[in-house]
Amino acid sequence: MTKPILLASLAALAIALPAAASASPANVVVVDNERVYAECNACRSAQASLQAQATTIQSRQAALAAPLKIEAQALQAAADALGGKTPDAALQARATAFQTKQNSANQELQRLQQNLQSSQANVLRQINAKLGPAIKQVMLAKGANLAIDMNNTLAVGSGMDVTADVLVALNAVLPSVSVTPGAATTTTGR
C-alpha cells in the first residue's frame, strides 16, 4: 500500500522539478546609458559637430544683432529728438525697414535653431536604432534576460554593469552618424 503512495509522490516530484528548474531567477545586467551616449565613438563625433553648429548659430546671432542694435539706438535717438511730435514719413519708413530687418533676422535664427534641433533628433534616432540591438547582443552573451538603465537602480552588484561591453558592441555597429537635419524639419499641422 505504501508503494503506490511512494510512486505517486515520486511521480509528482519528477513533474514539479522541471517546472521549478525552468523558473530560474532573472539574470539582470545594468547599462549606464548616459555614459554610452557620452563615450561612444559616433556620439563624440556627433557632439563635436553639433557644438560647432551651435557656435556658428551664436556667431550669426551676434553678427545680426550688432547692426540692429546700432540702428535701434539711432531710431530711438531720432524719436526722442522729436519731443513727442509725430514722426515724419522718412523716420516712419526707417522704423518699418528696421522692423522688417529684425523680423528677417529672427526668422533666420529660428530656422538655424530648428535645423540644429532636427540634427540633434536625427543623431539620437540613429544611435537609438543601434543601441537597442547592441544591448540585446550583450544580454545574450551574458545570459541575461533583463537590462536596466543605471539611473533606475538603487544598488548594483559587481559584474552586473555591462556598459563597457555595450560601448564595444555599439562602436562596432555604429562607427559614425549623419549630423544633418532629419527628413521632417517643419511641422505641417496634421
Protein language model features and the residues they cover:
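Bacterial N-terminal signal peptides
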Residues: A8-L17
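Amphipathic, charged alpha-helical segments and their helix-to-coil junctions
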Residues: T2, S22-R190
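Bacterial N-terminal signal peptides that target proteins for export
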Residues: M1-S9
